[in-house]
C-alpha cells in the first residue's frame, strides 16, 4: 500500500496539521482549521510569530466578526514532530529554499499540500508515457523538493480567497472561502477526503477535483500574463485587461499557454475572452507581482511564466509573446534587484559587440 492510500489518523482522533508559512493565506487557513477542531501548528517568523505566540491569530471579516485562535507557533519545525499534513503556504521560491526545513515534520504517511501559485514542482508525477516523472527546473532546480519531500506525498491545491496581514498576528479577510484539492494520480484518496473534511469543519468550502491540473492552469492562465504585464507597465488589472494594447498581449500569451496545456491533456472550461473579461471586472487591483516590485520583494516570475516557457520547450510549442514578456520582466526584475530568485537558473547571455 502506498502513501496515497494511507491515512495515519485514528477515527475520532484530532488531525495534526502544520501550516508552513503562516502569512496572509497560511494564517487564515490555520485559524479556520484550528477552529474546526484540527490540531494546528504554525511556522512563522519575526514580529508576526511573536504576536501569534502572545495573542494567537486573529482573522477579521467584512461583517465585523472575528475569529481568534491560539495554537502552537514556532520558527523551528523540529519542535513539532511528525504531522498528518504539512500545508506549504509559501511562494514557490521560498518553498524550494526551505525544503530541508520541512523534513522534521515528515513521518511515513505525512501528506504535503502545495498552496503555491503557478505550476507545482510535482506536476508530472503520475503521468504515463513520454512525460512521466519529468522534473521542472524553473520551479525546482536540481529536483530538490522532488528528492527531499517526494512527489508521492504531494496533494495539489488551488486557493481562491484573498487576505492580507494588517499588523502582526492580524489577518483581514477580503473575499472568498473556496479551495480545490486533488491527487497527482487523480484518485479520490482517503487522505484527500480527510483533508477536505477538515477544511469543511472549519467553515471553509473545499472540493475534490480529479483533474486538479485543470484548476491549476485556469488560475495560472491569468496570472502568467496579467502579473508580468502589470509589473512592466505599472497598470492595475482593469487597465491591463481593457487597454487594447495590453489586452492583445495578454491574449497572445494566453493562446500560447493554451496550446501548451492542451498538449499535456489540460481542459479549459472557459474561453480566453471570458477569462480576460473576468479579470477586468475585478477593478483597479494591483497584482501581486506589481506590489512585490514596488516593495522590493522577490517576484514569482519563474513559477508563473518561466515554467510555462520551460514546458513549451518540452512539448514543442513556439511562444513568441511569452518569450518577449518574460525577457522584459526578467530585466525589470534584475534592475529592481528582485530577480532571479533561483540563482541556478540565471545563465550568462551571449555578449555581442558592435563596432
Positions of PLM-derived features:
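Rossmann-like NAD(P)(H) cofactor-binding subdomain of soluble oxidoreductases
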Residues: 66-166
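Hydrophobic anchor at the start of a short beta-strand
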Residues: 17, 39-40, 112, 154, ...
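NAD(P)+-binding Rossmann beta1-loop-alpha1 motif at the extreme N-terminus of oxidoreductases
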Residues: 7-62
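Flavin (primarily FAD) cofactor-binding/catalytic cores of flavoenzymes
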Residues: 35, 44, 99-102, 191
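Internal alpha-helical scaffold of NAD(P)-dependent oxidoreductase catalytic cores
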Residues: 51, 105, 146-219, 225, ...
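NAD(P)-dependent Rossmann-like dehydrogenase/reductase catalytic/cofactor-binding core
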Residues: 10-13, 239, 247-355
